[in-house]
Amino acid sequence: MPAKVLDGKKIAADYRANLAQEVEQLKAQGVTPNLTVILVGNDGASQSYVNNKKKSAEKIGMSSSIIHLDESTTEAALLEEIDKLNNDDNVHGILVQVPLPKQIDETKVLEKIAPEKDVDGFNPINIGRLYAGVETYIPCTPLGIMEILKHADIDLEGKDVAVIGRSHIVGQPVAKLLTDANATVTLLHSRSKDMDAVLKRSDVIVSAVGKPGLVTKDVVKQGAVIVDVGNTVVDGKLTGDVVYDEVSEVAGAITPVPGGVGPLTITMVLNNTLLAAKRAQQ
């Protein structure tokens, strides 16, 4: 029996419908949640991502602005722009689109965004709060993965979960969230030994490496849930880490690429922006 397809577009659409209702309730109280995105330079993919975020926010009733700065913008000028947004009570969520030009230190930029407006969850203070188990903003892709897993008909408690990739954006935070859900988590990376053995016993595999063909049918146990966060362009086509067609034959449930995790990532940006607007009223 082929795997259940975990349709990120459908899950995201349902989630956004609920967000839209909450946005309307907040607007009735005189507060319109605002997401402001800063784009430095003219990278085509980045422009597309930024426009998508703006449209998605406006579609559920939020306001959204794009601040487009020149490629030659200095680090000091960008930090000054962020400072203005930090002090603007009408702005609830601030995103700075990466990658940034080489003259700008990304770490300094993330540190500059006020933690209470850091809807990406990348400010070191918010990362620390996540691991301390206190109120914070959870990075959007890990949050989206957890939402997808709710639709996979699996109780994570006590399950063996393999997370491939240890980035601060996906791998490490999703491992923390899965641990909080009482799963037994193994975090795998390029130096891991016996990766195949770990994958073969895993009830859930989350792959977030960006290496097409990494997860094949022979390392997936029958009925396992597969979440593919890979996002690599091969011959003009978006491709995940998982060999989808063959793994679908043995998996119990699987996310496609595209149309799996991606739609949930932007949805969780909206979720965190709404949360920031609510917290600002408290």
UniProtKB/Swiss-Prot annotation:
GO biological process annotation, one example: L-histidine biosynthetic process
InterPro entries: Aminoacid_DH-like_N_sf, NAD(P)-bd_dom_sf, THF_DH/CycHdrlase, THF_DH/CycHdrlase_cat_dom, THF_DH/CycHdrlase_NAD-bd_dom
Coiled-coil stretches noted in the UniProt entry, renumbered to this chain: none
Catalytic activity reported: (6R)-5,10-methylene-5,6,7,8-tetrahydrofolate + NADP(+) = (6R)-5,10-methenyltetrahydrofolate + NADPH; (6R)-5,10-methenyltetrahydrofolate + H2O = (6R)-10-formyltetrahydrofolate + H(+)
GO function terms (MF aspect): methenyltetrahydrofolate cyclohydrolase activity; methylenetetrahydrofolate dehydrogenase (NADP+) activity
Keywords: Amino-acid biosynthesis, Histidine biosynthesis, Hydrolase, Methionine biosynthesis, Multifunctional enzyme, NADP, One-carbon metabolism, Oxidoreductase, Purine biosynthesis
Keyword Nucleus attributed: no
Pathway participation: One-carbon metabolism; tetrahydrofolate interconversion
CDD domains in the cross-refs: NAD_bind_m-THF_DH_Cyclohyd
Function in brief: Catalyzes the oxidation of 5,10-methylenetetrahydrofolate to 5,10-methenyltetrahydrofolate and then the hydrolysis of 5,10-methenyltetrahydrofolate to 10-formyltetrahydrofolate.
Quaternary structure note: Homodimer.
Family: Belongs to the tetrahydrofolate dehydrogenase/cyclohydrolase family.
Protein name: Bifunctional protein FolD
Annotated organism of origin: Macrococcus caseolyticus (strain JCSC5402)
Source species taxonomy: Bacteria, Bacillati, Bacillota, Bacilli, Bacillales
Designated gene of the protein: folD
